[in-house]
Amino acid sequence: MMFSRNAAGHLAALLTILIWGTTFISTKVLLRSFSPVEILFIRFTIGYLSLLAFFPKFLPFRELRHELYYAGAGLSGVTLYFLVENIALTHTLASNVGIMVSAAPLFTALLAWLWLKRKRPGGRFFLGFGAAIAGIALIVFNGNTVLKLNPLGDLLAILAALIWAVYSILTRLIAGFNLNMVLCTRRIFFYGWLFMIPALFLFGFQPETARCFEWLNLFNLLFLGFGATALCFAVWNWTVKVLGPVETSLYIYLVPVVTVLSSALILRERLTPAAIAGTILTLAGLLISEERLRLPGIRTWRSLLKKQTTRPE
């Protein structure tokens, strides 16, 4: 039985999140040899070259407006998002960043309403958002950490979520060009790579070439560059085209879930009751927020209760 285009979009989003949720393991290994900005630059260089090798077709320049959208997407989704998130990690706890960045679906829904004139998010969306954020909080704090606010770092993490929302909206606008999304993703990477160059001088870029070819580092760089960047961004951008930015962004809720499960499987970290409860709550939040999944409303429950109470004995 063949998948419908919509079902394929959901499957693609899920597979992308499964890969993105495990990238922290590779990043953790690479941080022993490289700085965050070095990992970022090498990762997207490999990503761009991978797309160029597999899809060498040239994407012609058509309109200045198109190039501005590509540049905006590269600046937001490639350069600023990762840089702001990394800077936030130096000013606040990683657990805080994990929760704040998960607000991206909320910002995406609001921007889609204001910018794309889509339907205003309703009570069901906010209920799902609340459940997912509560679940993510249980996962990242894991019953061991008390919330400790750090205004600068927390604001930067929220800014990173907003930046990703901007990227999602720009990606949807780019999808409207009706061009090959892989080629569009490559053009986005190109601009993101260009915008990243000034940051290299700001944060320092002095990678040791020999360390890049150590087998463990090479494996993780290729995983991040080819798998988590070239493949996942191309698939994610196609998913935004199929499902729309809001519905696609909801899958971001699952990143902490995949992270905690992969930690248990790969790093043998203990899966606590708080993490299990958080996983269930996060999944519930995703299902509640999913508009196309019909859940029984108040009238349905009233009707069922009425039938039960009026049933003859």
Across the structure, where does each feature detected by a protein language model lie?
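Specific alpha-helical transmembrane segments that line the substrate/conduction pathway
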Residues: 38-49, 77, 86-124, 160, ...
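Helix-loop interface residues and adjacent transmembrane-helix termini in multi-pass membrane transporters
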Residues: 33, 91, 118, 177-178, ...
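Specific transmembrane alpha-helical segments of multi-pass solute transporters/efflux pumps
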Residues: 19, 23-24, 52-101, 111, ...
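Membrane-interface helix termini and inter-helical loops of multi-pass transporters
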Residues: 25-33, 89-90, 140-152, 202-216, ...
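Hydrophobic alpha-helical transmembrane segments of multi-pass integral membrane proteins
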Residues: 8-12, 38-53, 72, 125-134, ...
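Hydrophobic transmembrane alpha-helices of multi-pass small-molecule transport proteins
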Residues: 51, 71, 111, 121-143, ...
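Glycine-/small-residue-enriched transmembrane alpha-helix faces in small-molecule transporters
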Residues: 1-38, 75, 147-173, 195, ...
